[in-house]
């Protein structure tokens, strides 16, 4: 299975004494996106033999063994559904079981999670054991809203980590009978509101935007988002199937360089970001 590693330092002191260095907090973020029901290694083409949920689990185990479970944060940036017969035949239930078995700490939703309708999405979300985050759509009048929150807070590696979720523009990606039931909020406005809340009121050490809006393409991208917000430390993205071999550092409203990562598609790669604070 092809792997890659991201190393990013967030808020590292310019000068560390020996005591400071020993006390430094180290977090590992494992992330995937757009796995699209690809549960087995690819069978043909340039990617033959790559991917597979068993292989992803083995990689997870190796990272947890090396870094310690309490120091590893696992994220999925959406579109875990649709793309193989596992989804079309089993209606997305197997993917939910595997999300739970993999032990993700948090996920966001992609447009393909809605392919069987919002009612069936609610049925599947009821079985997911980790937080599901989405801040830029209002699900409050739907059954699915019981299982979706704008943000979550997770403690790992001695850090308090706030995670905000974003979905893509479903008005152009999802049937109107579905999208018309789910009012949208402005992406930058909701991220600024929740990021400020997480930093200032909840005392989060780190704020992550877990997005499915794409690194490139139309009508909105992660780089565009970063340029319009503050208080976000990392963007873990999906949707455009972009493979970033290293983080793209984008300036936010305050000129801070924010690392943006995305890991291709189909689970061919597993992102590994090291965060030191």
Which residues does each predicted region cover?
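Acidic, metal/ion-coordinating pockets
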Residues: 22-277
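Bacterial Sec-dependent N-terminal signal peptides
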Residues: 1-25
